[in-house]
Amino acid sequence: MARIAGIDIPREKRVEIALTYVYGIGLTRSKLILANTGVNPDTRVKDLSDSDVQKLRGATEEFTLEGDLRRKEGMALKRLQDIGCVRGRRHRMSLPVRGQRTRTNARTRRGSRKTVAGRKK
C-alpha cells in the first residue's frame, strides 16, 4: 500500500480515486495533483513506481491535509463560538447555521424528536 499524508491508500483502486481517501483531497484536487505530477489517473495504485509515489507525496505536501485540516476547521468553529457571533451561537446550540427554518425540518441538526405530553382539556 502506498502511504500518502499518513494514510494508506487502497492498492486496487485507480490513483485518481485512491487519493480521495486522504481527508482534504477530493476528486478535483486529485485530478490537479495528477496533472501536475504527470501520473496517469487510470493507473492502479499497486502499479505505481516508487518515483511516482514520491512525486505524489511531494505534490500533496503543499496542501493542508488530514489532522492539520481538521484542527484548522475546529479552530475556525471555536473562534466563531468564542467571539459570540450568531454563527457561533447556532453551532453551540446545534441548530442550522445558514438561515434555514427550524419550526419544521432541521431534524438532522437538532436530533431526534423530544416527546411533549399533550395538554388535557
Curated annotation (Swiss-Prot):
Tell whether RNA-binding is among the UniProt keywords.
yes
Annotated Gene Ontology cellular components are:
cytosol; small ribosomal subunit
Q: Which PROSITE patterns match?
A: RIBOSOMAL_S13_1, RIBOSOMAL_S13_2
**What InterPro entries does the database record attribute to this sequence?**
Rbsml_uS13_C (IPR027437), Ribosomal_uS13 (IPR001892), Ribosomal_uS13-like_H2TH (IPR010979), Ribosomal_uS13_bac-type (IPR019980), Ribosomal_uS13_CS (IPR018269)
A biological process (GO) of this protein is:
translation
Its keywords, alphabetically, are:
Ribonucleoprotein, Ribosomal protein, RNA-binding, rRNA-binding, tRNA-binding
Q: Does the keyword tRNA-binding apply?
A: yes
Tell me where on the tree of life, at the top rank, the source sits: Bacteria
UniProt GO molecular function: rRNA binding; structural constituent of ribosome; tRNA binding
Stated family? Belongs to the universal ribosomal protein uS13 family.
Q: What does this protein do?
A: Located at the top of the head of the 30S subunit, it contacts several helices of the 16S rRNA. In the 70S ribosome it contacts the 23S rRNA (bridge B1a) and protein L5 of the 50S subunit (bridge B1b), connecting the 2 subunits; these bridges are implicated in subunit movement. Contacts the tRNAs in the A and P-sites.
Which NCBIfam families does UniProt cross-reference here? uS13_bact (TIGR03631)
* HAMAP family the record matches: Ribosomal_uS13
Q: How does it assemble?
A: Part of the 30S ribosomal subunit. Forms a loose heterodimer with protein S19. Forms two bridges to the 50S subunit in the 70S ribosome.
Protein's name in the database: Small ribosomal subunit protein uS13
Q: Report the source organism.
A: Prochlorococcus marinus (strain MIT 9301)
What lineage does the source organism belong to? Bacteria, Bacillati, Cyanobacteriota, Cyanophyceae, Synechococcales
